[in-house]
Amino acid sequence: MISHRRTICSILSALVFLAACSAFEPSPPARVVRVKALVDVPFRNRNPGWDREARGLIEAASDYYEQEFGIRLTTQSVAAWPENERVPSTPTLLARLVKQFPVTSADGSYDIVVAFSGENVSRILSDGRPRVDRIGNCSQGLARYIVLPTRKLFRYTGQTTELDSDVLALVHEVGHVFGAEHVDDFNSIMHENFDYRSQFDAKNRKIIQDNRGCPFAK
């Protein structure tokens, strides 16, 4: 006959085990951002696996944002755009992006559109700089569009502390989506020249935390 003491001990052991397991379970993100990804002709030409590459860039940026802010980026779809024409200017590409994928005609399956470009234009030039449609805020809504020129082929290999330069660029632009602005702090990823910087300054960190629950622009 099994004693009451042994039964109680077994129950307590099971409860301790379950509590220990739950302690290691990741907490759900505070915000999930659904991404519609688009890739241009040069991006597709350099890598037959362009779908996987685009998803990897978003996942790498998501790893960073989920760890730092509890914001998860999820790729809903990846498509070829523009299909044939090359557009070596990020301001022009952004204007076309907003026109061809207006918020009013969105089907509700995504929150933001990220267009990846493989055009070989220096980021020093205006035509080669990453772009967003707006600096997000709670009163007018968070940004909806990003144009991101990429420098080289990227392969996602899992979460890492060493961020690729194109991933850093995407982290920077997503910062704008949530209201982060350029600063003079050379150590901040929101400095205009953000290469090899991987941390937000205190002001922009607070802005993102405060805005992460805000609605997207309509």
Question: Which residues fall in each region the model found?
Answer:
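Bacterial N-terminal signal peptides that target proteins for export
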Residues: 2-11
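The catalytic-center signature of Zn2+-dependent metalloproteases
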Residues: 143-218
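Active-site-proximal beta-strand/loop segments in catalytic clefts of secreted hydrolases
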Residues: 38-42, 76-78, 115-120, 180, ...
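Acidic/histidine-rich, surface-exposed loop or edge segments in extracytoplasmic proteins
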Residues: 31-48
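Metzincin-family zinc-dependent endopeptidase catalytic domain
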Residues: 51-169
